[in-house]
Each structure stands twice: as structure tokens, then as C-alpha cells.
Amino acid sequence: MSHDSDDKTFPYQKDDAELRRRLTPMQYEVTQHAATERAFTGEYTDTEDAGIYKCVVCSTPLFESGAKFHSGCGWPSYFKPLNGEVIDEKVDYSHGMVRVEVRCNHCGAHLGHVFEDGPRDKTGLRYCINSAALNFESRPENE
């Protein structure tokens, strides 16, 4: 699923040649063509350090470690984004399913999908995000 046919315009306009140079092949395919990394292979699946997860394309802060939980699905999971402005959600009809795609609201990078099977004592949502779409910035818990 490529974002080429998408009508939404995002504030950060990406240069494809620059992205191909800067990103790994997996990061490029995930963020620009909505590929999915294999379950349990992502760099941040089991990361428990305190910090912020940012968009690998534009460095927009997306999720904080306090919202991360172990869902057992094989991808980093969060019960909420950093705030309501950083995520764009779009219905995804690919692969014979109906899901909600999650994209960076600043650059349009594909991040993953959101499902309604997250922790009931929090938001009830599970943002299932590809590690390849993220960069992690470690920081002390009290910041």
C-alpha cells in the first residue's frame, strides 16, 4: 500500500531520493509503502527504557515509554500517542481486512495500525507500531 494515491497533504514534504539514502531499506518500505516488519524482529519490541519514540522520517515525538505495554503481538505496542495531534488515522482495506492505519501526522509516514484490544484499564487501544518507523530517544524517568 503506497501513500501515492492518498489525498491528504502533510506539513513535512519528503524528498524520495533523500529518504532512500537516509533510511534503511526496511525503514523506507515500512514508512513509505506501508510494509510490515516480521513479528518479534523489531529493535524496540522489548525495549523498556524510559524515553520518547519519534518518527524515523521527520523526528516528530509520537509515543512515550510510559504508554508502552507488552501485548505479545510481536511489535511495540502503546495504549496512547503522546498527544492527539501527532497521529493521523485512516481506514485501511488492504489484505482483505478492514483496519485503522496509523501515520505520522507531520510527514505521513506509515507507522502501523491501531486496534481496540488494548489495556481496558487505560484506553482500550493498542497502537501496534513497526520498530522500523521509530527512533528511540532515551531519557531519565523524571523528565
Swiss-Prot record:
Record's keyword terms, sorted: Metal-binding, Oxidoreductase, Zinc
Q: What's the EC number here?
A: 1.8.4.12
Q: Which domain of life is it from?
A: Bacteria
Could you list the residue ranges that cross the membrane?
none
What Pfam families does the annotation carry?
Answer: SelR
Identify the stretch annotated as signal peptide in this record: none
Family as reported in the entry's similarity comment: Belongs to the MsrB Met sulfoxide reductase family.
Q: What is this protein called?
A: Peptide methionine sulfoxide reductase MsrB
Q: Which gene encodes it?
A: msrB
